[in-house]
Amino acid sequence: MNPNQKIITIGSICMVIGIVSLMLQIGNIISIWVSHSIQTGNQHQAEPCNQSIITYENNTWVNQTYVNISNTNFLTEKAVASVTLAGNSSLCPISGWAVYSKDNGIRIGSKGDVFVIREPFISCSHLECRTFFLTQGALLNDKHSNGTVKDRSPYRTLMSCPVGEAPSPYNSRFESVAWSASACHDGTSWLTIGISGPDNGAVAVLKYNGIITDTIKSWRNNILRTQESECACVNGSCFTVMTDGPSNGQASYKIFKIEKGKVVKSVELNAPNYHYEECSCYPDAGEITCVCRDNWHGSNRPWVSFNQNLEYQIGYICSGVFGDNPRPNDGTGSCGPVSPNGAYGIKGFSFKYGNGVWIGRTKSTNSRSGFEMIWDPNGWTGTDSNFSVKQDIVAITDWSGYSGSFVQHPELTGLDCIRPCFWVELIRGRPKESTIWTSGSSISFCGVNSDTVGWSWPDGAELPFTIDK
């Protein structure tokens, strides 16, 4: 073989080896691509950040967690059997209130994508607590936030996000179209109640596990409305209170018993001279207690308690430590409506302990500012204004707003009692501040039988925003 033939032979061999190597590399790339496609083909669309999604399959919770690793989402599942939130325990004995959450939504919303909201509330399942809120179909610091002081519009929706997080399009879940709402968990699925429609014919849409299961039509054709806080569940049944009729006179009030999203029973209260709006309800020893707003003529709060058959009792908190706003200075109370400064009002709550009562209220007697918790050891039945504990929550120089109760069941906490908790809305913007919008953040506390501290946890946002200038 001459030198030229040797060169040609060696070159041919090298070319063959190179072609084979190239084909192997192409095959390797195709194999990796096919393997990746099979692995991720049945998963949800990639998200820009980590998130948890809970679905329901045959009364079993499936907790799906997406973990973002090198732009690839790996899905892990952990099935958790559903339970029944019994609600048969008593409220836990407490000596004060420990801070639980604060979302700082307005502060974050000056630069980030945060919903314009009002009427936030918290509700817990046996696995998690979520903040529910009524959006205005707009973001803070955006042109669509203009005019959001309005309570009822077709753009308002009930949404929810993990407790303590600022409500944004990236962490929030749509629940219902609503300008008045409630929600609660029976241990198997979430029940949501969303009211929308015209003032003279609104309809409440009930959803169970996200599916429409029932509706309730306005029966007085005068702004059907509900709690703006969580409904209460006992032994698989959930209970809510609705109002239909004048906000400044005698209206109609109904209790609804709901099972798996279907109304199974309702009772209209026989309550002349009473006014119930925006009730804050909680379970206690198998029964339900609701503390409400009298927007007609009471500066103390009306209550209704009932058993699972909807057999009920009604009254007003007797204490001379008045809980509504506006209200007179503390003095001599009444077990009926206290008339001075009794018109108008604000959503609030109290927790009954025997003859005693924890009263949550604004610090100001005539504006929605400040917040405090007061323990009146005889206030449920006694009319004096003596109290033994006062815990500061928000200073009188800072804005507050609505407040309401929620509970954490033993199935969540591992305690042998129902833990009482509350949230406070921190309203900012119109009508008290020079902005084009109205919105709020929230803070929450839970009752404990250990050390606590009073302080001020205000909203803290610096206004006006860029859109307001």
From Swiss-Prot:
Its cofactor is Ca(2+). The chain crosses the membrane at residues 7-27. Residues 36-90 are annotated as: Hypervariable stalk region. Pfam families: Neur (PF00064). Substrate binds at residues 118, 152, 277-278, 293, 368. CDD domains: Influenza_NA. Residues 1-6 are intravirion. Ca(2+) binds at residues 294, 298, 324. InterPro entries: Glyco_hydro_34, Sialidase_Influenza_A/B, Sialidase_sf. Residues 28-469 are virion surface. Catalyzes the removal of terminal sialic acid residues from viral and cellular glycoconjugates. Cleaves off the terminal sialic acids on the glycosylated HA during virus budding to facilitate virus release. Additionally helps virus spread through the circulation by further removing sialic acids from the cell surface. These cleavages prevent self-aggregation and ensure the efficient spread of the progeny virus from cell to cell. Otherwise, infection would be limited to one round of replication. Belongs to the glycosyl hydrolase 34 family. This is Neuraminidase. It comes from Influenza A virus (strain A/Duck/Hong Kong/2986.1/2000 H5N1 genotype C).
